[in-house]
Amino acid sequence: MKYNSPYEIGLGDVVITTDDTGYKTEHLVLINYIKGETDAKGYTPKRNRTILVDNYGNRTTVYDYSQMEVVA
């Protein structure tokens, strides 16, 4: 299932992203920034973005939430 809104993304969600070659990778949601919403430290992002972390600790930034699939 794909996300319909950035508000549906939860911290700790396990998601699958697909790269340009069709290879699917499983990630964990680390941070979800929503455009126009201020976080606890006073940061307000200008666009939506989600920061993911894989099993090896590598971080990936996704700007289009519809590219991520939720693992049930």
Language model: regions and residue ranges:
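Intrinsically disordered, low-complexity, charged/polar segments
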Residues: 45-72
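Intrinsic disorder/low-complexity segments
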Residues: 14, 34-39, 56, 67
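Short histidine-centered beta-strand/loop micro-motifs
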Residues: 41-43
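Mixed-charge, Lys/Arg-rich low-complexity intrinsically disordered regions
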Residues: 1-14
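Short beta-strand-centered aromatic/proline hotspots
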Residues: 22-39
